[in-house]
Structures are given as structure tokens and as C-alpha cells.
Amino acid sequence: MPIYELDGQAPEFPDDGQYWVAETAVLIGRVRMKSQSSIWFGAVLRGDNEWIEVGERSQIQDNATLHTDPGFPMVIGSNCVIGHKVMLHGCMIGDNSLIGMGAILLNGARIGKNSLVGAGALVTESKSFPDNSLIIGSPARVVRSIDDKASAMIAAGADVYVRRWQQYAKGLKRVG
């Protein structure tokens, strides 16, 4: 897997060894993974300006792109699901949140805990959303609060990916 140091800054991994990075993912510079987190195929995490932190039991799915600008670090909370082809740029995502496939979050955006950003949503610069929000559209807006059932669904998604990366860590073998 391509893991690069840049200007003396290298990605950091949990001491307990409980994480997984797909061999086609790219991690550069200031990237910090927490325990039970995973980075999937084709994802790029480019910590060349500020830190990118991936919280415990969170996953970055296939072909997601994460980048920062000076003054805009990125923190992804615990138990988060970052969907396929999501683009995150210098934003903050609260615990137990799901960012749907193809969503874009720009510098300074803040997503509260237990929130769901719909597929294809565009969260503009410095836009902030409260906890328990269902966020959709372009530009993104809150359409309602998340109920306990939806919050449990997000948590279940994080659980599935913890089991999945453990399966891949043990059983994935290159055959060609």
C-alpha cells in the first residue's frame, strides 16, 4: 500500500494494530488512524497541509478523497461511515455519522453527531449542521431530525465494516 512521509510527517497508526488499509489506498503525510478504522480501495488521504484524523471504528470507503488546506484540519469522529466516492475537504464530522456516496463537504463544514448526509449532497464552505440532522441537496440543507432507528442504522453500518476489514485482513489474497 502506498504510504508516504512528506516533509518529515508520516501517517500514524494505532499501537494495537487494529486497523486495515487496502493496498490501493494512498496515505500521505499527516494522517492519523484510530483503532478499528479502515481505509478502502482507491481512497486517497492527503495530509499535506493539516492533520486528517479517522476516528475509532470509522471507515473511508472506496475511491473517497480526503484533503486539507492550511487552517482547515479534518476530524472524522468515531463510528462514522464515509461512503464511496465522497470528497471531504478540511471539515469536521461528528461521531456516529454517515456521509452518503458522492457527497462533497468543503472547508470548514461541520456535521453534528448522529447525522446523515445524503448521497450527492454539497455541503458548502463553513456550513454547520446540528446533531441528529438528515442533510440533503445542493446546496445541502437539513430536512428533518434523525430518529433512533436511523441512528442505529448508521451504527450498524460501522459494525459491518469493522467485521469486513477483519475478514479482508485475514482472508484477502492476491491471485494475479
Per-segment meaning from a language model:
Residues P2-D15, M74, S78-I82, V86-M87, ...:
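C-terminal segments of enzyme domains that contribute to small-molecule binding surfaces
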Residues G17, A22-E23, I28-G29, K34-S35, ...:
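Left-handed beta-helix
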